[in-house]
Amino acid sequence: MNNQKQQKPTLSGQRFKTRKRDEKERFDPTQFQDCIIQGLNETGNDLEAVAKFLDASGAKLDYRRYAETLFDILVAGGMLAPGGTLADEVIRTDVCVFSAQEDLETMQAFAQVFNKLIRRYKYLEKGFEEEVKKLLLFLKGFSESERNKLAMLTGILLANGNLSASILNSLYNENLVKEGVSAAFAVKLFKSWINEKDINAVAGSLRKVNMDNRLMELFPANKQTVEHFTKYFTDAGLKELAEYVRNQQTIGARKELQKELQEMMSRGEPLKEISMYVKDEMKKNNISEQTVIGILWSSVMSCVEWNKKEELVTEQAIKHLKQYSPLLAAFTTQGQSELTLLLKIQEYCYDNIHFMKSFQKIVVLFYKAEVLSEEPILKWYKDAHLAKGKSVFLEQMKKFVEWLKNAEEESESETEEGD
């Protein structure tokens, strides 16, 4: 048996050739720019030819290294200096976004050029996003027409999914906001975005990157109100965006109201103070009584640890709700609010199985405490109830509803006798 270790082959002296398809011509940025500009100029503004040229050039030129230069040229016609002006003594091309016609159709055609390029060379995605973030910070260095074209193009690319809505962060730059550049740019951007998709798709993209609650920041701090935002964007023809932001603010205000209510209740603050706070919030954020009664109900029900035994939970619930009846009564001044509360009670008792037998007792308590009145209860019983557990709850309410109807008839006959 041979105990000698076999010598492993070494690679010294070996030279490996790069496969021809992996070779890239090594240029400095200026040489790279010259090659791209020369090729673009030869296309004669034919964007189909531009897309083909860019596709073919990626095999020879180092797009990965010079992505910024490539995108500068395609947008502005040449390499950009800090601030957004074209670098001194550079050659430039008119086959670019900034030299194109200022209309949606042309920008859609340019968007296709970027789309094809990025789909062909996936590694350019990140570089392109960084480029757009940079261009947005340079907005003050561009003319109004150049900004408009960039805004339209960006909106289309956002709609196509070539860009993430996180690029909008650049628009919150203090100087751009202060001078009104951000808001004006956003108008053009959102118009083209909504034109390609719709407000629901836009909202989804904004939500994905937690940008849905930040649109107010397009304005200086002293103008960050729903009223100002709504007027500005409605006047600019973007009513759907204005309504979306108004709804977002209302949703935010509701969440804040619920959170504060739960804290006030857990601290045991007087009902009078809670009522005053709620009324102020309703006025300030334009929240309806129907919405408020729903928030109050869920806050009241979530501020206590419920007994798990069905036979004990009803007694506990009645005691707890009796305490909060005056507060609830203050926000059921309309029949629709009473009906909303009835539906919330039904839903709660169905979703929390220990409360299935408590429904009728809660309704009777609220009737006696003048939180609920006859008409909404009868309407709920007749045709306004939910499907959830309806057979159980209607059966529970049968006798009480009959009593209400009899009481109503007696009251009517007494009135007639009096007449």
From Swiss-Prot:
Q: Name one Pfam family in it.
A: W2
The source's domain of life comes to Eukaryota
Q: Name one GO biological process term.
A: regulation of translational initiation
> What Gene3D superfamilies does its record include?
1.25.40.180
All copies of the W2 domain together span 247-414
Q: Where is the composition biased (Polar residues)?
A: 1-15
The answer to whether keyword Transcription applies is yes
Under the heading InterPro entries, the entry gives: ARM-type_fold, eIF5-mimic_regulator, W2_BZW1/2, W2_domain
What residue spans carry the region label Disordered?
1-26
Q: Which SMART domains match?
A: eIF5C (SM00515)
Q: Which UniProt keywords apply?
A: Activator, Transcription, Transcription regulation, Translation regulation
The family annotation for this protein states:
Belongs to the BZW family.
Primary role = Translation initiation regulator which may repress repeat-associated non-AUG (RAN) initiated translation probably by acting as a competitive inhibitor of eukaryotic translation initiation factor 5 (EIF5) function. Enhances histone H4 gene transcription but does not seem to bind DNA directly.
Q: Mind telling me what this protein is named?
A: eIF5-mimic protein 2
State the organism of origin.
Xenopus tropicalis
Give the organism's phylogenetic lineage: Eukaryota, Metazoa, Chordata, Craniata, Vertebrata
Gene behind this chain? bzw1
